Amino acid sequence: MSNVIENLGKLDRKVTLAIPKAEVQKETQERLARLSKTVKMSGFRPGKVPMKMVEKQYGQQVEFEVRFDKAARKFFDITQAQEVKVAGQPKFDIKTEGVADDELAFEATFEVYPEVKIGDLASAEVTRTKTEIGDAEIDKTVDILRKQRVHFHARGDAGAHGDGGADVAAQNGDRVTLDFVGKIDGVEFAGGKAEDFVYVLGEGRMLPEFETATLGLKVGESKSFPLTFPADYHGKEVAGKTAEFTVTLKKVEWAHLPEVDDAFAKSLGIADGSVEKMRADIRENLEREVKRRTHSMLKDQVMEALLKVSELDVPKALVEQDQERLVEMARRDLEQRGMPNAKDMPIPAEMFTQQAERRVKLGLILAEIVKANGLEAKPDQIKAEIEDFAKSYEDPKEVMRWYYGDQQRLAEMEAYVLENNVVNFVCDKAKVADKTVSFEELTAAPAQA
């Protein structure tokens, strides 16, 4: 049954490919003849190696390549002629039974793309998150920016910013410099001793018992106290054990936050020092972050809704291909993090089975919904998105050139626009419930890709 595609199941197919031996022999000889012109062998000049020696050395390998090249070409011709959409790569096996003497036969097993049924989008439920940016959010951001530019001054010292008050004892928010030594059963341990150690009280950098013991100390004072390390402490050699610590305070400095004035605005890149312009820029940046996060959350909601209302079988070949991509992505990530031997590290593909299945499913669903509803990314849409992105930069035209000068970056923006088209299309048809959350709640939620 040469050239007839057999149905082996939902997506599995098989076709027998018959190839005349004469064709294989003819092409093998042609390839060997071309090879003989460049092959190098000891004792012969390039191109002067006898054909018999070339055949002996390379004949079997070349014939093997010709067989499978012809099988692949024949497979492509048959599936294309019958308009069969092949998913992934076919598997070729040599067939030996029931084959004519003057032919070679292969059995190609493969999968086809599934039929994708998109259900009733009107029944899909999507939550659309909304967040408003007001003065309170801008004020909080200004406070964060002030804390990032904090200056510390010694308590009790008079100066341009005062002395931080008459109380020279260490308080939460103060930066302290101290020496400490810890012992377990009277013996010092690794990491339990330091000189001129600096940290800010109340930020949670140290264990609570350590910070509590430091509070209220004045310069020159010492204090001894017991400290029990948590059972899950990162230092396994001391986890769950009790140490006796002694701390000696050497310096206490209070935090001076810069005033919100023209000098502060200039430090943030506002050329004329306008506080009003600074706040406007902060609002714009916060609104951009809100747009990014809410769009990502909405996209995730839409994708989940599409998965729920769609029916399709998933080709194993595509899942396996995506597993390989995810393994390589994980390996590159480990390399970037400085993991030694990341290139050779064994990463089981099975770790990514569920993720790959979901990605393949969504890819097939999106392709179907885009094709059926004409949701392809239009050039003017892509340009509008790039222009919107470029507005936040000093030289928008340079950003535009940067995007249009690289096909990969342009393809990424095209994919983004296409996803937007799908999201908008689904939201127009689905049951959409708006949910308003604060900026703090929005940023506390896990960021979506």
Curated annotation (Swiss-Prot):
Q: Kindly state a single biological-process term from the GO annotations of this entry.
A: protein unfolding
Give the molecular function GO annotations.
peptidyl-prolyl cis-trans isomerase activity; protein folding chaperone; ribosome binding
Q: What class of enzyme is it?
A: isomerase
One GO cellular component term: cytoplasm
Pfam families named in the record: FKBP_C, Trigger_C, Trigger_N
Query: Where in the cell is the protein located?
Result: Cytoplasm
Q: What is its EC number?
A: 5.2.1.8
Q: Which UniProt keywords apply?
A: Cell cycle, Cell division, Chaperone, Cytoplasm, Isomerase, Rotamase
Q: Which reaction does it catalyse?
A: [protein]-peptidylproline (omega=180) = [protein]-peptidylproline (omega=0)
Identify the residues that the record assigns to the PPIase FKBP-type domain, covering every copy.
173-258
Question: What PROSITE patterns does this protein map onto?
Answer: FKBP_PPIASE
State the NCBIfam families in the record: tig
Family of this protein: Belongs to the FKBP-type PPIase family. Tig subfamily.
Function as written in the Swiss-Prot or TrEMBL entry: Involved in protein export. Acts as a chaperone by maintaining the newly synthesized protein in an open conformation. Functions as a peptidyl-prolyl cis-trans isomerase.
About its domains, the entry says: Consists of 3 domains; the N-terminus binds the ribosome, the middle domain has PPIase activity, while the C-terminus has intrinsic chaperone activity on its own.
Which HAMAP family does the UniProt entry name for this protein? Trigger_factor_Tig (MF_00303)
Q: What is the designated name of this protein?
A: Trigger factor
Report the source organism: Cupriavidus metallidurans (strain ATCC 43123 / DSM 2839 / NBRC 102507 / CH34)
